[in-house]
From Swiss-Prot:
Cell wall formation. The lineage of its organism: Bacteria, Bacillati, Bacillota, Clostridia, Eubacteriales. The active site is at R177, S227 (proton donor), E297. NCBIfam families: murB (TIGR00179), PRK13905.1 (NF010480). PROSITE patterns: FAD_PCMH. GO terms for biological process: cell division; cell wall organization; peptidoglycan biosynthetic process; regulation of cell shape. InterPro entries: FAD-bd_PCMH, FAD-bd_PCMH-like_sf, FAD-bd_PCMH_sub1, FAD-bd_PCMH_sub2, MurB, MurB_C, MurB_C_sf, Oxid_FAD_bind_N. Pathway: Cell wall biogenesis; peptidoglycan biosynthesis. This is UDP-N-acetylenolpyruvoylglucosamine reductase. Pfam families: FAD_binding_4, MurB_C. Its EC number is 1.3.1.98.
């Protein structure tokens, strides 16, 4: 029995977590559909289980990682040594007046739907973002001139000591695809959004318009992690990539989408190595042509 199998037994016995998998292929848990096995993947149902797992990992010196639904995650082919804590079962959501209070595993689509049902406006921009709340807040996700920082009020997080604290919007230091939560390695448990009362028909029309635009412009028929690169200041990554002659460029089954050059897609059987090689080709070509560095928006973890 290796140390991770022994640790999995401790998790089951001490923390009463039933959903624990050993050597679980991460390609089954990411939207890119690639990635080697993680030593332990567990899916807690409650805040206190997440807190207890984090504390136990720290005590036993076991590396741990946090994920939602894996829509912005690229796991390398060698997999992950340690524990992956998947938060998708933290999925409670409630409405109090103009506020939506949601656990970190709730999808942005479900929040958009809840807002619509309660005639709350401000969250329409996120209707097509495939991620869950925790990752979206951590990265200050955005689309169509909206972003999380415009609608968030507070977040309940686990800080590095294992203590649960509440951060207000200013303390989160939300910028373009960044936050103090990301910088400090905090884990989000719950988020409160503050929206405005609106007209249900107008909200629905806005959601339908954004969904139509997204379907027309993005390669949703293929596995991907959404926009692969962050937007360089004063430029658009997709235009730089296309102007570098890279639309349709492929490595194995990884391809710069012919529909939207800002997306690298998996056409079926790509490996993480294929995707990472293609990312490097894109970065090198754009740097050579425009003297601009492209940085990945997708989170890359694991071993080669």
């Amino acid at each position: 029995m290796n140390k991770f199998e022994d640790f999995a037994i401790k998790l089951r016995e001490i923390l009463d977590i039933e959903d624990i998998k050993i050597d679980e292929p991460m390609k089954e848990h990411t939207s890119f559909k690639v990635g080697g096995p993680v030593d332990i993947l567990l899916t807690p149902k409650h805040f206190n289980q997440v807190v207890d797992v984090v504390k136990l990992c720290k005590k036993e010196n076991i590396p741990y990682y946090i994920m939602g639904n894996g829509s912005n995650l690229l796991v390398k082919d060698g997999g992950i040594r340690g524990v992956m804590i998947k938060l998708v079962k933290l999925n409670k959501i409630q409405v109090k007046g103009n506020k939506i209070i949601t656990e970190s595993g709730v999808s942005l689509k479900d929040i958009s739907t809840t807002a619509l049902e309660n005639c709350l406006t401000g969250f329409e921009f996120a209707c097509g973002i495939p991620g869950s709340v925790g990752g979206a807040v951590t990265m200050n996700a955005g689309a169509y001139n909206g972003e999380i920082s415009n609608v968030i009020e507070s977040a309940k997080v686990i800080c590095n000591s294992g203590e649960i604290i509440v951060l207000n919007r200013e303390e989160m230091e939300l910028g373009y695809r960044m936050s103090s939560i990301l910088k400090n390695g905090y884990t989000i448990l719950e988020v409160t959004f503050n929206l405005e009362k609106g007209n249900k028909e107008n909200i629905m029309n806005r959601i339908e318009d954004l969904s139509r635009r997204r379907n027309e412009k993005q390669p949703l028929e293929y596995a991907s992690a959404g926009s692969t690169f962050k937007r360089p200041q004063g430029h658009f990554a997709a235009k730089l990539i296309e102007d570098s002659g890279l639309k349709g460029e492929s490595v194995g089954d990884a391809q710069v989408s012919e529909k939207h050059s800002g997306f690298i897609i998996n056409k079926g059987n790509a490996t993480a190595k294929d995707i990472l090689t293609l990312i490097s080709i894109v970065q090198d070509r754009v740097r050579q042509n425009f003297d601009i560095d492209l940085y990945t928006e997708v989170r890359i973890i694991g071993e080669d």
